[in-house]
């Protein structure tokens, strides 16, 4: 990748203060912040300070008080950065501060009112206005929108916004997000629509400090690719990337305040309200502490990175401590131009948070970036589009559907043409209509046909010619009397088939032309929709505006330098007209030095207290992690077998890209195991698991204690029962004793089981016996039905 290296430049830091809210005024809070716009200084007064304690003063690149407008911040600070992005640099703008100090207002503002629009909508307008005024350049603008919620990266433009994305790193391109969606936009309306879709899926919630507070860090990424023909006749591509960051608000849980209802962060269309860094007593509860802990960790990691970069003594920069710092790696000390907007609250109850934000921003001033132009990268989408357009154009020229247009002087205007058949519904293709100018007189000739009109005309003419030719051939076949009817029919069918093939080819050509125009419409070409002299006037106005902003910046720097020079002059001046004058001058100097000494002592004391507070927070976090670790070890030692624990430990590996421990898959990635293996049986040959001791006991004997099945062994009687018939005469009366003897004899013969006995199904012994019949019917039943030995009843 070729690049134009530029000398290192410092990260630009500006401070902005909002006015007191009605709620703060009603509560009686006083204003403790003083902004000096000309000198770029912020003075913070401690409301709990002892008498005689001096306020703290911080100096920044620019300062905007409560009366400042959105346009002032954008024109003086952000506009030069957007111009650099259009030239091929990487740029980042992010707002940092306490929750409710106006970070989202600074970044987004109110979209419906032009005067209240923030950095993001003004950047949209700036980018596409610049493209429309450019000459002989092709642009491709892409947009992506993501958020970091509880250290998980989510794509806000995806159909599944809750899906977790992976963070990867390429040695050539740097850090990137795998499977992050990107949309090509052609105007301000489309890119605003993309952002509104993402805002609907962003996580926001309510806290004591802000009713609509951002619960995630949101990053809107705009990639601008520009192609321009150089002096060598080759097309050179520049790629600029703009990161617009809206940080979430961290929480200080130990600060008093009414609790708000808990619950998970909601999905709202507000796009975040509070957003931002610093510590905040927001009175959050429920799921908010969990969100706040993740936000605090990421912002603490951001502070550690800035401290390491500003100190110039650390060889290791902890970019990998959080997802936020890894994504902003180029923006902090890398290949980017970065602007940090520190938003402040003027109320007395926010003294600690404002002081923390000011110290954070003051450290960030010392960070040095090394921005360079990203020229001719390998993975540009614009180059792919140009190659695809050239291929489609060659196919159309081969089919004769695309003719060469003569070169002419033209004043161009833009026209919207509805999409042809085969193009997605509702799409609009931008066609450029050129009108020739007559050099002799100022009259315009009729407008020349557009590319789409020329294509449609060529297609219609070609189809009409082929149809006429086929009709003539069909008529000639009909008139030819030398042909047999079967041959005529066959030839006519061939002609009809040729006509159908012609129509299908025509449809394929139309689809190809539609694809060509769709690809070409995504490339924005400047200088075609506004008069050239108007473009020049607008460019002059922008240059004047930039000169005024640059003059203000130089004036501010000169005033700061004059103050330093005055102090040095007073120290160097050693001649006095009298002893009284010398005493007065040295007394004044002594008071000033004593005030500086007291300020340094107070700063040291504040730093010591902050160090103790940070150390206590770290100790508390360490103790909490130690308790969780002990609990997990206790569960593992008591509930997980050692062999299973060893299996789990053997599968663990460290993912260096994400800094996380992960499990190796059970089946290797290269093995194609289409059939799933069967689960191993616990006891082969048995229905239930049986111990080894029970198996040995079963082999030694048939003790039922060790058997899982077939506990009892019973011999099966397979001989069928014998059934015999008894016949009695109803009129003959017999002696009961004779009947009894006959029954006994028949019973003996039954026990002998003769082979001639009839086999019938009998009732089992376990069935309940039926009620015996009356005595008068016994003989009749015995005479009419066979008698079973078990059913013989003596009624004597």
From Swiss-Prot:
The keyword Transmembrane does not apply. The gene is Kif3c. It is found in: Cytoplasm, Cytoskeleton. It holds the Pfam family Kinesin. This is Kinesin-like protein KIF3C. Heterodimer of KIF3A and KIF3C. It comes from the Eukaryota. GO terms for biological process: microtubule-based movement; positive regulation of neuron projection development. Residues 270-284 have a biased composition (Gly residues). Keywords: ATP-binding, Coiled coil, Cytoplasm, Cytoskeleton, Microtubule, Motor protein, Nucleotide-binding. Residues 633-793 are annotated as: Globular. Residues 401-416 have a biased composition (Basic residues). Residues 251-292, 397-421, 754-796 are annotated as: Disordered. SUPFAM superfamilies: P-loop containing nucleoside triphosphate hydrolases. The lineage of its organism: Eukaryota, Metazoa, Chordata, Craniata, Vertebrata. PROSITE patterns: KINESIN_MOTOR_1, KINESIN_MOTOR_2. Residues 378-632 form a coiled coil. Belongs to the TRAFAC class myosin-kinesin ATPase superfamily. Kinesin family. Kinesin II subfamily. One of its GO terms (molecular function) is microtubule binding. Microtubule-based anterograde translocator for membranous organelles. Transmembrane segments: none annotated. One of its GO terms (cellular component) is growth cone. ATP binds at residues 97-104. InterPro entries: Kinesin-like_fam, Kinesin_motor_CS, Kinesin_motor_dom, Kinesin_motor_dom_sf, P-loop_NTPase. Residues 10-367 form the Kinesin motor domain.
């Amino acid at each position: 990748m070729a690049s134009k290296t530029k000398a290192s430049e410092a990260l630009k830091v500006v401070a902005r203060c909002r006015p007191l809210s009605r709620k703060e005024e009603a509560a009686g809070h006083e204003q403790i912040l003083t902004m000096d716009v000309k000198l770029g200084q912020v003075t913070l007064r401690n409301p709990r300070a002892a008498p005689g304690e001096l306020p703290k003063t911080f100096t920044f690149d620019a300062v905007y008080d409560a009366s400042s407008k959105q346009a002032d911040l954008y024109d003086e600070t952000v506009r030069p950065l957007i111009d650099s992005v259009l030239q091929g640099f990487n740029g980042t703008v992010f707002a940092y501060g306490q929750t409710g100090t106006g970070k989202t207002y600074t970044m987004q503002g109110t979209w419906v009112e032009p005067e209240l629009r923030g950095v993001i909508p003004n950047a949209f307008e700036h980018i596409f206005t610049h493209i429309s005024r450019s000459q002989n350049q092709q642009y491709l603008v892409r947009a992506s929108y993501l958020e970091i919620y509880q250290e998980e990266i989510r794509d806000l433009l995806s159909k599944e916004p809750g899906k977790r994305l992976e963070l990867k790193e390429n040695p050539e391109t740097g850090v990137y997000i795998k499977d992050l969606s990107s949309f090509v936009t052609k105007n301000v309306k489309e890119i605003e629509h993309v952002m509104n879709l993402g805002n609907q899926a962003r996580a926001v919630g309510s806290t004591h400090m802000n009713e609509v507070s951002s619960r995630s860090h949101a990053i809107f990424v705009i990639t601008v690719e520009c192609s321009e023909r150089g002096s060598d006749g080759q097309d050179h591509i520049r790629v600029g990337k703009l990161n617009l960051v809206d940080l979430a608000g961290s929480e200080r849980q130990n600060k008093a305040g009414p609790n708000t209802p808990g619950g998970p962060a909601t999905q709202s269309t507000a796009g975040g309200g509070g957003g931002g860094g610093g510590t905040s007593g927001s009175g959050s509860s429920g799921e908010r502490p969990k969100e706040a802990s993740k936000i605090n960790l990421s912002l603490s990691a951001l502070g550690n990175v800035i401290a390491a970069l500003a100190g110039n003594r650390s060889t290791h920069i902890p970019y990998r401590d959080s997802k936020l710092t890894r994504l902003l790696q180029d923006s902090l000390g890398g290949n980017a131009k970065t602007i940090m907007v520190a938003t402040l609250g003027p109320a007395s109850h926010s003294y600690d948070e404002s002081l923390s934000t000011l110290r954070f921003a003051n450290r960030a001033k010392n960070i040095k970036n090394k921005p360079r132009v990203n020229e001719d990268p390998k993975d540009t989408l614009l180059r792919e589009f140009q190659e695809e357009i050239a291929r489609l154009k060659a196919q159309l020229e081969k089919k004769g559907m695309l003719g060469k247009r003569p070169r002419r002087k033209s004043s161009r205007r833009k026209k919207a043409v509805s999409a042809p058949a085969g193009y997605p519904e509702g799409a609009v293709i931008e066609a450029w209509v050129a009108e020739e100018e007559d050099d002799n007189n100022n009259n315009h000739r009729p407008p020349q046909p557009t590319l789409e009109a020329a294509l449609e005309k060529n297609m219609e003419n070609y189809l009409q010619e082929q149809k006429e030719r086929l009709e003539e051939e069909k008529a000639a076949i009909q008139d030819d009397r030398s042909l047999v009817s079967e041959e005529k029919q066959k030839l006519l069918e061939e002609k009809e088939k040729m006509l159908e093939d012609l129509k299908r080819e025509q449809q394929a050509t139309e689809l190809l032309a539609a694809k060509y125009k769709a690809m070409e419409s995504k490339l924005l070409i400047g200088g075609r929709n506004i008069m050239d002299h108007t473009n020049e006037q607008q460019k002059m106005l922008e240059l004047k505006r930039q000169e005024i902003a640059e003059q203000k910046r130089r004036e501010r720097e000169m005033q700061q330098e004059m103050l330093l020079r005055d102090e040095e002059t007073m120290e160097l001046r050693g001649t006095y007209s009298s002893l009284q004058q010398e005493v007065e001058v040295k007394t004044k100097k002594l008071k000033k030095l004593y005030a500086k000494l007291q300020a340094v002592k107070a700063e040291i004391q504040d730093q010591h207290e902050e160090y103790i507070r940070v150390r206590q927070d770290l100790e508390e976090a360490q103790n909490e992690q130690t308790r969780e670790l002990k609990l997990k070890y206790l569960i593992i030692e008591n509930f997980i077998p050692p062999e299973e624990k060893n299996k789990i430990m053997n599968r663990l590996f460290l993912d260096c890209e994400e800094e996380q421990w992960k499990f190796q898959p059970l089946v290797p990635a290269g093995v194609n195991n289409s059939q799933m293996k069967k689960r191993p049986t616990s006891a082969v040959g048995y229905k239930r698991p049986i111990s080894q001791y029970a198996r040995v006991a079963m082999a030694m004997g048939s003790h039922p204690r060790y058997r899982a099945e077939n506990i009892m062994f019973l011999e099966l009687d397979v001989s069928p029962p014998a059934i015999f018939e008894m016949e009695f005469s109803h009129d003959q009366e017999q002696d009961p004793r004779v009947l009894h003897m006959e029954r006994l004899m028949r019973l003996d013969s039954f026990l002998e089981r003769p082979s001639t006995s009839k086999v019938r199904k009998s009732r089992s012994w376990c069935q309940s016996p039926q009620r015996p019949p009356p005595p008068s019917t016994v003989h009749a039943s015995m005479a009419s039905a066979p008698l079973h030995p078990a059913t013989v009843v003596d009624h004597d």
